[in-house]
């Protein structure tokens, strides 16, 4: 049976995972599953707004309401607010506590259910909450040491993800700015007209029709599209007589056009 040191090493090894390896929809499902296996419990991770980032159900908690939390990927506002007031780990909370993960209607089904809440911090900020629970059996001191380590590890990962997202946003903005600076006034006018034709981020358009409507030549539109495509802002595909299919890859172009 793994001892505390071995379990700690398993948890800290999570930090070796690249941010790029995180899932898109529930980025911390794998992490929650790993924590659930190591600590022997159910686990979920929510951000500061109560959005579900990942969960693992090692033991079935047969309540429709808990399952609804995971299906909608959002915890109730009242619960999120109560959890946000937990500044240090609260361990072995009974089914009578407001922070129990067990809904009121399941108290008789899981009278010995226990919940542990651990705040997640990163860079001095509250980033979310780690919630673990069992249908019975208290979390031991060793378990709680692992919980503290787990919340720290998750905090570092969340902070890394925020940093990655910020860097990606800045990169995209820089690319858009550089591309816009290469466009003439007529080409900017063409780009604005083209993107207004799209249904969301993609759609079909006919360059000659747009050119006639805004009073420019078709070549201006073609040149503008080439510049945006070479910058990785859009993708285009000829549809022959039906026109051109266009898809926006870098949505920062929309914000930039608002300034035009």
UniProtKB/Swiss-Prot annotation:
Domain of life from the UniProt record: Bacteria
Localization of this protein: Cytoplasm
One CC-aspect GO term: cytoplasm
Keywords of the record: Cytoplasm, DNA-binding, Repressor, Transcription, Transcription regulation
The keyword Repressor appears for this protein: yes
Record-linked InterPro entries: ArsR-like_HTH (IPR011991), CodY (IPR014154), GAF-like_dom_sf (IPR029016), GTP_trans_reg_CodY_C (IPR013198), Transc_reg_CodY_N (IPR010312), WH-like_DNA-bd_sf (IPR036388), WH_DNA-bd_sf (IPR036390)
DNA-binding stretch(es), residue numbering of this chain: 207-226
Functional description taken from the UniProt entry: DNA-binding global transcriptional regulator which is involved in the adaptive response to starvation and acts by directly or indirectly controlling the expression of numerous genes in response to nutrient availability. During rapid exponential growth, CodY is highly active and represses genes whose products allow adaptation to nutrient depletion.
Pfam families: CodY, HTH_CodY
Gene Ontology biological process terms, A to Z: negative regulation of DNA-templated transcription
Family per similarity comment: Belongs to the CodY family.
Protein name: Global transcriptional regulator CodY
Annotated Gene3D superfamilies: 3.30.450.40, Winged helix-like DNA-binding domain superfamily/Winged helix DNA-binding domain (1.10.10.10)
Region annotation (GAF domain) ranges: 1-159
MF terms in GO: DNA binding; DNA-binding transcription factor activity; GTP binding
